[in-house]
């Protein structure tokens, strides 16, 4: 009875790879702020901040933009300040 319900051992189980076979390797995203040596992210610099906002006006996550955690916090704070000062919209119209 225990033989029927037992799990296969590690040697019997096929190994799965994290990346699909033959798939292209993903290139690591570059932190735009660090690459361009931007030390201060100003809330009045809407051209820079618009790079980190989606079409609908949402703040893009780190995994999409490639920014570091520290720079993502700076960008988020600057975007929120710009929204309060009405330099950036909270949401966009379709």
UniProtKB/Swiss-Prot annotation:
Biased composition (Low complexity): 1-12
Alphabetized InterPro entries for the sequence: Ribosomal_bS18, Ribosomal_bS18_CS, Ribosomal_bS18_sf
Keyword Ribonucleoprotein in annotation: yes
PANTHER family linked to this entry: 30S RIBOSOMAL PROTEIN S18, SMALL RIBOSOMAL SUBUNIT PROTEIN BS18M
Oligomer and partners: Part of the 30S ribosomal subunit. Forms a tight heterodimer with protein bS6.
Function: Binds as a heterodimer with protein bS6 to the central domain of the 16S rRNA, where it helps stabilize the platform of the 30S subunit.
Designated name of the protein: Small ribosomal subunit protein bS18
Organism whose genome encodes this protein: Leuconostoc citreum (strain KM20)
Organismal lineage: Bacteria, Bacillati, Bacillota, Bacilli, Lactobacillales
């Amino acid at each position: 009875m225990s033989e029927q319900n037992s799990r296969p051992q590690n040697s019997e189980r096929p190994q799965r790879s994290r990346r699909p076979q033959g798939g292209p390797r993903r290139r690591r995203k570059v932190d735009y702020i660090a690459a361009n040596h931007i030390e201060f992210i100003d809330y009045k610099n809407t051209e820079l901040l618009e790079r980190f906002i989606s079409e609908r006006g949402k703040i893009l996550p780190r995994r999409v933009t490639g920014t570091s955690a520290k720079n993502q916090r700076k960008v988020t704070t600057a975007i929120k300040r710009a929204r309060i000062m009405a330099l950036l919209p909270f949401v966009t119209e379709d």
